[in-house]
């Protein structure tokens, strides 16, 4: 049993002495918990009197190129196929101007390795500049116009997606040629219609299809192209993508 001790309090009232019970471990534990609960109650009353302040979101400044790279240079190399040498040479001024002036990067075309090389330097301020420049050059190499590819530098929510027609349906010979013709349409009418409705840009290079746009728009354009490959008539595909586009416009 726990030992019980009696102690007289100096503040006695009416001639009666106040008796406090002191026990063993349990009593000491209760006495230690009482002050902490009193402090919590006092803090709660103080907090009730104060006005509730909304929590502020932490603001982190963007990383600078110098602090992130810490003196190390990063490089990206984009191979250039033979059929894109002439367009690259003709549009070289339009390509390197935004990369050098706006992104603060260094760019060159290596004649030996046939690669476009981009690297960071002291003037690079944005950490994502190298990735944006590489995507911009890659989009031009795939066949997009310089004006369309520039959107990859200006906007953050644009992406590139590539797939092959044979990934959707294993076609060969004349069947593959007809599938390519259904995607393009007479004079490119079908391709232009899909681009305008889905707000994307499409490049049809042999059996490869490249789509430039936002995630949701790429999904709509890819669905329409896959339906054409599988044999759906263009009129039905037009109706489907217009319905999906109108629902997306109403939602936003």
From Swiss-Prot:
Instruction: State the protein's purpose.
Output: Part of the small subunit (SSU) processome, first precursor of the small eukaryotic ribosomal subunit. During the assembly of the SSU processome in the nucleolus, many ribosome biogenesis factors, an RNA chaperone and ribosomal proteins associate with the nascent pre-rRNA and work in concert to generate RNA folding, modifications, rearrangements and cleavage as well as targeted degradation of pre-ribosomal RNA by the RNA exosome. Positively regulates dimethylation of two adjacent adenosines in the loop of a conserved hairpin near the 3'-end of 18S rRNA.
Q: Which organism is it from?
A: Bos taurus (Bovine)
Coiled-coil region list: none
**Keyword annotations from UniProtKB, A to Z:** Acetylation, Nucleus, RNA-binding
Q: How does it assemble?
A: Part of the small subunit (SSU) processome, composed of more than 70 proteins and the RNA chaperone small nucleolar RNA (snoRNA) U3.
Using the record's annotations, give every residue carrying the modification N-acetylmethionine. 1
What is the official name of this protein in its record? RNA-binding protein PNO1
* Subcellular location(s) per record: Nucleus, Nucleolus
Pfam families recorded = KH_PNO1_2nd
Identify its protein family.
Belongs to the PNO1 family.
Single Gene Ontology BP annotation = ribosomal small subunit biogenesis
* Any one GO molecular-function label of the UniProt entry: RNA binding
Looking up CDD domains in the UniProt record yields: KH-I_PNO1_rpt1 (cd22391), KH-I_PNO1_rpt2 (cd22392)
Task: Identify the GO cellular component terms for this protein.
Answer: nucleolus; nucleoplasm; nucleus; small-subunit processome
